[in-house]
């Protein structure tokens, strides 16, 4: 295989290769892969030669069974990798079957069983003019670098529909209907032995004699499923991109969704994992892909730590064989077009020795099973006038810095409306309780110290013995609480101000204190009548605080 890639000839040798050849997995004899692989211009050895680096080994059967000539010159070491341009893309999530009920309910001419007719619809994007054709029960063959599909019968091939360039274009062809009443159950799925695909959607770039895009195509392979109620649905299998007569198998990257898509509704669960941060440190943006599970979940720093300390993916816990960093580049903002500063972007630029731009740059994977090359600074690979950014930022834009959430005020900082302005913040809660007690004693009401109407502090609860003693001394004048002792025995100026306010309060302040007492009385069990009363708790006032009863 290495000799085939090293040759530079105009064509490819016409080798007679059977269907079950060495280019089918598993092969009859020998190995499918060699003992090393090249990525980013570097060579990596692996002790698992039969391990597909970008997915499952069975995915290799979706590729062609014949070797092809690699059309590009092997890049020199430390030379940026050339990226491929995708001119056509079929959104596989939009692929669906549309049933025609009028024709499905009508019996056939023979009167055997009713016809079950469906048609295919999907959405696609095109940066060039394309020609789309649908094939059913078709086999694949590559001729001169182009994929040619041959259906089982001519009636299983649709007419070719031409489209102009555009985004989010809808494909619908009611004239081509699929009659599942004529299909067998084994024809609904992909047959590996025969190499027959249930349905193939081929979109070929149709730009005339433009050499740059000649032979460029996008292929969607799908299968059908039959449900218990007799209905059918379509299931995408794989997508392939054919560029310069080479077929590339497209693989999904998990965690790279475009959040700007209006069709995708945001999740109501705030705890869902829909952020762009690394799943390990929860601070830096994700820019490292784990292979072969293809989870984009790590930042640069955590990836360097993981490759030396563990060999399992933090998401699926499967062992990984390589780490691939993917980043993008953008034009630097000019003097007249300032761009808001992003601290996350600044952190990414500070770790430039680990960066690996996606375009015009060289990715540096790390393999635990192979050598661990030292990463070099690749700032020279960034084109002039561009700067590297995260791939997630390129898709979803720069992340806006959320404003700082103000912290909740401390207990001492809460202001009370019934206290004079001369009191300090630390003495406000004590003065408020003292004011309520003094105003209640001035009215001369009987005081009840029942346990149900007692205001307790979590740091100093009242024991049962104290509760019984308080219930016996109902008619006796109440002793001074801890709050009153703390205020009246103090010699500070604030304590004198507190006593003056309590003893000679103005009518307005007395009314305000009475309103507070009325609120407390309305919430008592006698006024509410809601069954067993509930205890009221306040945060601890301090290490020397004690519980204070509320007058009824």
Curated annotation (Swiss-Prot):
<keyword id="KW-0472">Membrane</keyword>
<dbReference type="GO" id="GO:0045744">
    <property type="term" value="P:negative regulation of G protein-coupled receptor signaling pathway"/>
</dbReference>
<dbReference type="GO" id="GO:0006513">
    <property type="term" value="P:protein monoubiquitination"/>
</dbReference>
<keyword id="KW-0519">Myristate</keyword>
<feature type="compositionally biased region" description="Polar residues">
    <location>
        <begin position="450"/>
        <end position="460"/>
    </location>
</feature>
<protein>
    <recommendedName>
        <fullName>E3 ubiquitin-protein ligase MGRN1</fullName>
        <ecNumber>2.3.2.27</ecNumber>
    </recommendedName>
</protein>
<dbReference type="GO" id="GO:0065003">
    <property type="term" value="P:protein-containing complex assembly"/>
</dbReference>
<keyword id="KW-0539">Nucleus</keyword>
<dbReference type="GO" id="GO:0016020">
    <property type="term" value="C:membrane"/>
</dbReference>
<keyword id="KW-0449">Lipoprotein</keyword>
<dbReference type="GO" id="GO:0070062">
    <property type="term" value="C:extracellular exosome"/>
</dbReference>
<dbReference type="GO" id="GO:0016567">
    <property type="term" value="P:protein ubiquitination"/>
</dbReference>
<keyword id="KW-0833">Ubl conjugation pathway</keyword>
<feature type="modified residue" description="Phosphoserine">
    <location>
        <position position="471"/>
    </location>
</feature>
<dbReference type="GO" id="GO:0005783">
    <property type="term" value="C:endoplasmic reticulum"/>
</dbReference>
<keyword id="KW-0808">Transferase</keyword>
<keyword id="KW-0832">Ubl conjugation</keyword>
<feature type="compositionally biased region" description="Polar residues">
    <location>
        <begin position="504"/>
        <end position="523"/>
    </location>
</feature>
<keyword id="KW-0597">Phosphoprotein</keyword>
<dbReference type="InterPro" id="IPR013083">
    <property type="entry name" value="Znf_RING/FYVE/PHD"/>
</dbReference>
<dbReference type="GO" id="GO:0005769">
    <property type="term" value="C:early endosome"/>
</dbReference>
<comment type="pathway">
    <text>Protein modification; protein ubiquitination.</text>
</comment>
<keyword id="KW-0862">Zinc</keyword>
<feature type="lipid moiety-binding region" description="N-myristoyl glycine">
    <location>
        <position position="2"/>
    </location>
</feature>
<dbReference type="GO" id="GO:0005634">
    <property type="term" value="C:nucleus"/>
</dbReference>
<keyword id="KW-0963">Cytoplasm</keyword>
<keyword id="KW-0967">Endosome</keyword>
<dbReference type="GO" id="GO:0000209">
    <property type="term" value="P:protein polyubiquitination"/>
</dbReference>
<comment type="subunit">
    <text>Interacts with MC1R and MC4R, but not with TBXA2R. Interacts with TSG101. Interacts with mislocalized cytosolically exposed PRNP; this interaction alters MGRN1 subcellular location and causes lysosomal enlargement.</text>
</comment>
<feature type="short sequence motif" description="Required for TSG101-binding">
    <location>
        <begin position="406"/>
        <end position="409"/>
    </location>
</feature>
<dbReference type="GO" id="GO:0007507">
    <property type="term" value="P:heart development"/>
</dbReference>
<keyword id="KW-0863">Zinc-finger</keyword>
<dbReference type="GO" id="GO:0004842">
    <property type="term" value="F:ubiquitin-protein transferase activity"/>
</dbReference>
<dbReference type="GO" id="GO:0007224">
    <property type="term" value="P:smoothened signaling pathway"/>
</dbReference>
<dbReference type="GO" id="GO:0005886">
    <property type="term" value="C:plasma membrane"/>
</dbReference>
<feature type="modified residue" description="Phosphotyrosine">
    <location>
        <position position="411"/>
    </location>
</feature>
<comment type="function">
    <text>E3 ubiquitin-protein ligase. Mediates monoubiquitination at multiple sites of TSG101 in the presence of UBE2D1, but not of UBE2G1, nor UBE2H. Plays a role in the regulation of endosome-to-lysosome trafficking. Impairs MC1R- and MC4R-signaling by competing with GNAS-binding to MCRs and inhibiting agonist-induced cAMP production. Does not inhibit ADRB2-signaling. Does not promote MC1R ubiquitination. Acts also as a negative regulator of hedgehog signaling.</text>
</comment>
<feature type="region of interest" description="Disordered">
    <location>
        <begin position="439"/>
        <end position="552"/>
    </location>
</feature>
<dbReference type="GO" id="GO:0061630">
    <property type="term" value="F:ubiquitin protein ligase activity"/>
</dbReference>
<dbReference type="InterPro" id="IPR045194">
    <property type="entry name" value="MGRN1/RNF157-like"/>
</dbReference>
<dbReference type="GO" id="GO:0005737">
    <property type="term" value="C:cytoplasm"/>
</dbReference>
<dbReference type="GO" id="GO:0043231">
    <property type="term" value="C:intracellular membrane-bounded organelle"/>
</dbReference>
């Amino acid at each position: 295989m290495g000799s085939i890639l090293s040759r530079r000839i105009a064509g490819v040798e016409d080798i007679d290769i059977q269907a079950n050849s060495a280019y089918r997995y598993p092969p009859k004899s020998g190995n499918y892969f060699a003992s090393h692989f090249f990525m980013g211009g570097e060579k990596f050895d692996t002790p698992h030669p039969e391990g597909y680096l970008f997915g499952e080994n069975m995915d290799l059967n979706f590729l062609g069974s014949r070797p092809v000539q690699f059309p590009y010159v092997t890049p020199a070491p430390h030379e940026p990798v050339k990226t491929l341009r995708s001119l056509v893309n079929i959104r596989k999530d939009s692929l669906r079957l549309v049933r025609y009920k009028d024709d499905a309910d009508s019996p056939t001419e023979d009167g055997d069983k009713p016809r079950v007719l469906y048609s295919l619809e999907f959405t696609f994007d095109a940066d060039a003019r394309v020609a789309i054709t649908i094939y059913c029960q078709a086999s694949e063959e590559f001729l001169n670098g182009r994929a040619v599909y041959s259906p089982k019968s001519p009636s299983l091939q649709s007419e070719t529909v031409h489209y102009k360039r555009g985004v989010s274009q809808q494909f619908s062809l009611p004239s081509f209907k699929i009659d599942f009443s004529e299909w067998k159950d084994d024809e609904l799925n992909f047959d590996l032995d025969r190499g027959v695909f249930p349905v193939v959607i081929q979109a070929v770039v149709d730009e005339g004699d433009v050499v740059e895009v000649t032979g460029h195509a996008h292929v969607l392979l799908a299968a059908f499923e039959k449900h218990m109620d007799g209905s059918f649905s379509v299931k995408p299998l794989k997508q392939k991109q054919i560029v310069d007569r080479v077929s590339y198998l497209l693989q999904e990257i998990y965690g790279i969704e475009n959040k700007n898509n209006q069709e995708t509704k945001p999740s109501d669960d705030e705890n869902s994992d829909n952020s762009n941060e690394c799943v390990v440190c929860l601070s830096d943006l994700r820019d490292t892909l784990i292979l072969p599970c293809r989870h984009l979940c790590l930042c640069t720093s955590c990836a360097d730590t993981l490759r030396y300390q563990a060999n399992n993916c933090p998401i699926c816990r499967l062992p990984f064989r390589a780490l691939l960093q993917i980043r993008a580049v953008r034009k630097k903002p000019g003097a007249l077009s300032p761009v808001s500063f992003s601290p996350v972007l600044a952190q990414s630029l500070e770790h430039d020795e680990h960066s690996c731009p996606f375009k015009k740059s060289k990715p540096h994977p790390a393999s635990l099973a192979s050598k661990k090359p030292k990463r070099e600074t690749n700032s020279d690979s960034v084109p002039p006038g561009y700067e590297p950014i995260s791939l997630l930022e390129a898709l979803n834009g720069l992340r806006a810095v959320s404003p700082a959430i103000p912290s909740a005020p401390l207990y001492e900082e809460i202001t009370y409306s019934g206290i004079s302005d001369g009191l300090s913040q630390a003495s406000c809660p004590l003065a408020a309780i003292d004011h309520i007690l003094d105003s209640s004693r001035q009215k001369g009401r009987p005081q009840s110290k029942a346990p149900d109407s007692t205001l307790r502090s979590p740091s100093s609860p009242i024991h049962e013995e104290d509760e019984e003693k308080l219930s016996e001394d109902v008619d006796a004048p109440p002793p001074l609480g801890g709050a009153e002792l703390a205020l009246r025995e103090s010699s500070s100026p604030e304590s004198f101000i507190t006593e003056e306010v309590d003893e000679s309060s103005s009518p307005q302040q007395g009314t305000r204190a009475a309103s507070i007492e009325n609120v407390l009385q309305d919430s008592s069990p006698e006024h509410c009548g809601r069954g067993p009363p509930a205890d009221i708790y306040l945060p601890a006032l301090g290490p020397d605080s004690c519980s204070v009863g509320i007058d009824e």
